[in-house]
Every structure is written in structure tokens, then in C-alpha cells.
């Protein structure tokens, strides 16, 4: 019934706003339909080039070949420049592509159905995922296929719960071959499957180095390796068959990992780098203000203001992060951040989540580690999209029902994460829809999860700490932030000079919620051992 209700709501949204992601997927349909496979990752007819792994390309190929003739005649599969593409197709194409998103989301329903029937608690988790505002915003208004992809990913999580480790490895490998963003979560799967399925420390006693070899369950290790490797080999089999060379595979990698896109996205995802960028903006404004003062002689001994002003003027034509451009970002005051710094930070914080998992390998630890790996990649990764917050929200949903202490970080994450998606829907007709639906979802599921987690809490009596009250104040203040941002968008203060101000407000305020929730979960994960037994 929940899924049927969700379909009804989605059908009401088919005529709503759609983003350029609609053009992206329409162009991918055209590429896979009109061109031979060897040209898929080389075509530049349209700026919306194919930049997803091969399995998703095959998915687009499948959709293009089941497209009805009347939709093809509408221009759905015409390969053309982005300058004229929107003038060629009509509403028939829009309806068809909307329908494919709704239909593909059946995978999400299938992955959750059997799990939801096991208990009322599981049903609560599954229904909250199916009705999550993030999927409604990203897939059924903005336009993407996240529900379908997360259905595959969730299947791997549920397989871990059922101790079907080979199935989990298979489903995660398939997910990775559909969308490479799941690569951020691969370390958690690697450590867990290695420890739970391939290593046996029962009655282990180190005598010689032979003892270390004996803890390896070689049969399981080979089976696991066979499942993972065969998935990737089958995925790339068509490219192998047509004789792709090393240079051709490098072309695919360059499409999947375009480092030239810069540290931050056009709209800053609410992570550490949005705070970093904001501080750089504030320092830039401060330096400009100090430069106008007459009495700054003493300051010149500490700060070389003329040199900073010269640097700021030099960067005026560059992408300073607030121009809505997708390219390398240049900071005026703070040090520049290369990709290796983001990778090092991501790896460091993921390692902190992986070590406890290796020594205490169970489902609770796995979900906790998976969530923290998602946090690490989202907060410190390179060119993170705001949509990637779902990589953290979905695993955390399986975790929060296990204990009351996890509720506050979860509410902080989901509320700030969902609100951070609001700028994707900037038209007036979507303003009330996104607010009312998200607000209703938060009220219903925050209250329900609170009741369930209270029953599952087996520790000592829990006090309501100041942090919890502060978190509630933060969540309530999200609504004024949304309204203020709406006013800024309407009036465009400063004749458009501060057009990025509302996005900066969203990004900075939501980053506080995401960052605080990460700290809260990290503390519980590393220092509250009874919670993970």
C-alpha cells in the first residue's frame, strides 16, 4: 500500500519542473541508440556526455530500445547539440522518461518487500525509505534514477543482515558497475566481507607465520573473488569483445572521474568544503574592507594587504566557487585544495570507521561503519554533489532503529540533508510542495522512529542532554532559513550581485547539521561499545 501511495504521488508530479538532468538522460538514450558501443564514451555531440559506468549505459540502451515508436517520432532519441535538443522533443518524451523512472523504482520496492514483512520495525524502515523526500525531489521532480540504483544497493545491505555474503558482494558489485559513487563505500564492504567470510579467528593462537595463513578460509576467499571479478568482467565484456585498448579504458576512466570539475559543485554540497569556501569569502570581504581604511599601518606589519588585494583581483576572472560554474575553484585567502588532500582526509576518516569493524564484525558495526564511510566521502570528498547525501541517509535509516541514542544524529542528518536538496527545485510552483511534503515526512517518521528506538533501548535511563535540545532548535530553525532564502531569491538584493547568497545560506546552515550529526555518530561508534554488541 505504501508503494502504491508513492506511485500516486509521483504521478501527480510528472508535469512539474525538470532539471538539465532530464536532458542528460535523454541524450544518453540517444547515444546508446544511435551510436555503436565503441563511440559511447567518445561522443561529444552534446555537452551532456556519458559519464556513468557501463551497466548504466546498458540500462539506457535497454530503455532506448523499448521506447515506443510514437515517442521516437516525438524526438526522444534524436542525437543533437544541447542548443537545439529542447526544441525538438515534446511532452510525449517527458511523459515517457518520467514513466521509466517510476517503473525502474520497482527494484527498490522488491529489495525492501521481504525485509519489511519480518517485523513492524522493519516496515517502518522500509516505508520511510520508499517515501523519503530525497527520492521524490531527486527522481520525480529534478529527474534521476536514484530509487532504482539504491534498490540494488539496499539489496546488498539486507543480504549482509541475512548473512548471505556472496549475494551481498554480487549486489554491491552490480551497484558499483551502475554508478561509481558507491566506490566510496567499497572499503567498508571489503573489510566486512574479508573479516566475516574469509577469515576465521576462532581459537586463533599465533605460533609462526603459518598460523596467519591458516586463518584464511581459502575456499571462501576464491568464491568471493570469483563473484566480484566475474561481475566486472561481464560488465566490460562487450568492450573487451570489440577490442577496446588500454587507451580506450583510460577514456572511460576520464569520463567517470573528471578531476577538472573542481573541489566543489556549482551549488556547494553542505560539507566541510562549503564551510572552508565560506570562510574564504568572509576573509576576502574583510581584506577588501581593511584596504579601504586609512589607518592600517600596524596591520601591514602582520598582513600584507596590498599583496592579498592583488591576488584577489587576479582571481576575479577565475571560478571562485560562487559563480555557479563547474570547474577548478580558486581561493583568495586560504590555501588551494588539490584532490590528494581530499582523498587523504576521506581515507583517514574512513579508516577510523573500518578498524572497529575489523575487530568487532557484526551487522550493527557494519551499518555504522557504512554510514561513517558515507559521511567521510560526503564531508571531505572531491567535487561532491548535494545528491550524495542519500549515501549517508539510507544506511543510517537501517541503523537508527537499533538504539535511542542514535536518533538525534539521525534527525540532524536527515532534516539538514533533505533541506539541502531544496535549491534543486527553485521554481515557485515547487516551493510549497517540497516544504509541506518534507515537513510531514519528518513529523511522521521522527515520532515513529522515536517510539520504536525507545523500546529497543536497553541501556540505562537516558537523560535529555543539552545537545538534544540544541539539535531540536536547529531543526526547527530550518524552516526560517528556507523562507529567508526564498525571499533572497525573489528580491535579488544588490541587483543580482548577491545571487549566490541564498545558496550559500542553505549550504552553510545545512553543513552545520550534517557535520554535527557526523560528530555525534562518530562519538557513539568509537566510545559507546555496548551499543554495538
Kindly give the residue locations of the regions a language model identified.
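General structural concept
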Residues: 2-68, 154-161, 165-171, 204-213
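Hydrophobic alpha-helical transmembrane segments in multi-pass integral membrane proteins
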Residues: 60, 97-108, 112
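Histidine/cysteine- and/or acidic
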Residues: 161-265
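Membrane-interfacial catalytic/cofactor-binding modules of polytopic membrane enzymes
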Residues: 22-27, 31-70, 77-98, 133-149, ...
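Alpha-helical transmembrane segments
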Residues: 1-10, 105, 126, 475-482, ...
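Hydrophobic transmembrane alpha-helices
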Residues: 109, 113, 117, 153-162, ...
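Start-transfer (signal-anchor) and selected internal transmembrane alpha helices
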Residues: 1-15, 114-123, 518, 523
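Membrane-embedded helix bundles of polyisoprenyl
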Residues: 86, 103, 121-158, 165-186, ...
